[in-house]
Amino acid sequence: MVLIDSSIWVDFLQSGHEPQLVQLLGLQEVLTHEMVLGEVAMGSEDQRKNALQLLPLLPMAQVADHVEVMALVDRYRLYGRGVGYVDVHLLTTVVLKPGMLLWTRDKRLRAAARQLGVAFMPVLH
């Protein structure tokens, strides 16, 4: 399963073109997260409308609690690296679920996901 970050959803909702995401959706390999839904819903009116139609239909990843998030931050020294609290929530969710990966275009979040061995690496076309 792949947890899709808001950076991927925003690009997809704007362009409608993300072949690998379409493929993952068809294979039912996509998860969303309540914080991703919230972030994407804060975009433009059209983006918000599309996000609120699509994302709630997808399986929702279990949300990590604050203690789990902070433990991951401390264990992997994720502070001071430009990775935000929402980002660390996504990382924690993925780390706590073996086999789950995180797909993002955010450079710092992707670097942290790589460090933790949970980065989804799309096939380039």
Where do the PLM segments sit?
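Short, well-structured N-terminal submotif of metal-dependent ribonuclease cores
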Residues: 1-32, 41-53, 118, 124
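Conserved nucleotide-sugar phosphate-binding/catalytic loop shared by glycosyltransferases and other
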Residues: 57
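Active-site neighborhoods of divalent-metal-dependent phosphate/nucleic-acid chemistry enzymes
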Residues: 12, 19, 60-123
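Alpha-helix/helix-capping structural signal
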Residues: 7-8, 35, 107-108
